[in-house]
């Protein structure tokens, strides 16, 4: 049997049933890193300001539709389609959707698992 899992985004389980957080890692059976699809409309203000200090995970966000502002401490970073942003484990972060909302892929893993230059 081939060790491949293929899912359409519409097949992913939604946290809370509202379609904002989709469990991509769980749906695909990924065990080596975290992965979620996150979709927020304009004006969505409930994205938590948080860190991953306790679990030691850095996160990478990839915006594929819409736009957002990544608030990290006292700094803000504009995220447009095609933009990647990496946030270290201890850094506070919050996603604020742009005027047309945002759809992004969030990846998480523990630093040091891979070489940075590979």
Regions found by a protein language model. Name each.
Residues 1-34, 41, 115-118:
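A short, N-terminal "cap"/entry segment at the start of jelly-roll beta-barrel domains
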Residues 48, 70-71, 87, 93-99:
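Short beta-strand His + acidic residue motifs that chelate non-heme Fe in jelly-roll/DSBH
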Residues 56-69, 73:
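Glycine- and acidic-residue-biased ligand/ion/polar-headgroup-sensing regions
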Residues 74-89:
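Short acidic-glycine-tyrosine-enriched beta hairpin
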Residues 94-118:
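Double-stranded beta-helix
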